[in-house]
Amino acid sequence: MFTFIRSNLNNLKAYTPHSAGSSEILLDRLDTNECPYDLPDNLKQKLAENYQQLIETNRYPDGSHLKLKEAIAKYVNEVTPSANISANNISVGNGSDELIRSLLIVTCVGGEGSILTATPTFSMYSILAQTLGIPVVNVGRKESNFEIDITAAEDAINHTKNPSIKAIFVVHPNSPTANALNSQELVWLRSLPDDILVVIDEAYFEFSQTSLAEELNQHPNWVILRTFSKAFRLASLRVGYAIAHPEIIINLEKVRLPYNLPSFSQAAAQLVLNHSQHLLSFIPEILRERSKLFATFGEIPALKVWKSAANFLYMRLTDEGLKLMGKSSQDQSLSSLMQRLKTQGTLIRHTGGGLRITIGTSEENQRTVERIKGIF
């Protein structure tokens, strides 16, 4: 209809999260890998006091994010003492999505480069690249353990021209498949030349407790992304951060929007960092629940479930499961299963050729088990 809209947006599909809609039943929201617990009341009260006493809503937020950057650097060094990070190594975004977009602008926009991803993986890398007109090269993963097809990746790097691959995006652990980078993948990442940006998304670090932050000094072309949306319970406030060489940070700061992070979001992020030990104390419970769910789903012949290093599980249907669903394909069967669970009150995500189920509270997980067993 409008000829001024870029033609290459016609085939682009926007990221579409579930909508709770007007459902009258209790919904167990296990589709977006959030923490199942809200902030404690005492911290919410403290945030309310900060909002009332310290934040002037008629003033723009702190555009330098300096206090928040210093708090983030302190946290990174506490959990990874050998990282030796300072505020100069930190850039803050309105969620990690903004930082992904900024990294794409810094490296690839204007025909300067392509990006490489290994699917299935987090879809926003490709979506954001396409919105910027950046070519995306996808390689596969091994079906057994979802390890990156390194041979295919190397071939893509060597043969992709005009533009060549300038950035590689990996998640550690991967979403939706929940596997952490293994030794072969790490050897490959360490071997990549300095003229390729390596983006390691550690959104689920607090659950996996595996990080590459201590290697940043040896690999100045690496960037680590993290978020406050998962373990720190601030999904509604959209705070993410990048850890990288100061020169990369300087360029990220050049392309980000001014005043990109509201004062309330900055205050909340600083508050949760000051109470990180208490807030993260729920993680052992999530890991126990994950182990229970993995064992339970593994006993259902209709399901194939993979081990997880994150706060979610990934599964597909076996041949028996496909037969029970009465569909001709994995995709159709998974869509049908997802919809049946939704009508019963459990939201999960159908993505990457499988189903991704967030680990919820014990009660939510029990309801999910009962509903899945009721179907099979």
Swiss-Prot record:
Descriptive protein name: Histidinol-phosphate aminotransferase
Modified sites of kind N6-(pyridoxal phosphate)lysine: 230
Reactions accelerated catalytically: L-histidinol phosphate + 2-oxoglutarate = 3-(imidazol-4-yl)-2-oxopropyl phosphate + L-glutamate
Matches recorded under Pfam families: Aminotran_1_2 (PF00155)
Principal EC category: transferase
GO molecular function, one term: pyridoxal phosphate binding
EC number: 2.6.1.9
Pathway: Amino-acid biosynthesis; L-histidine biosynthesis; L-histidine from 5-phospho-alpha-D-ribose 1-diphosphate: step 7/9
Taxonomic superkingdom: Bacteria
Family indicated by similarity: Belongs to the class-II pyridoxal-phosphate-dependent aminotransferase family. Histidinol-phosphate aminotransferase subfamily.
Keywords on record: Amino-acid biosynthesis, Aminotransferase, Histidine biosynthesis, Pyridoxal phosphate, Transferase
Example GO biological process: L-histidine biosynthetic process
Signal peptide: none
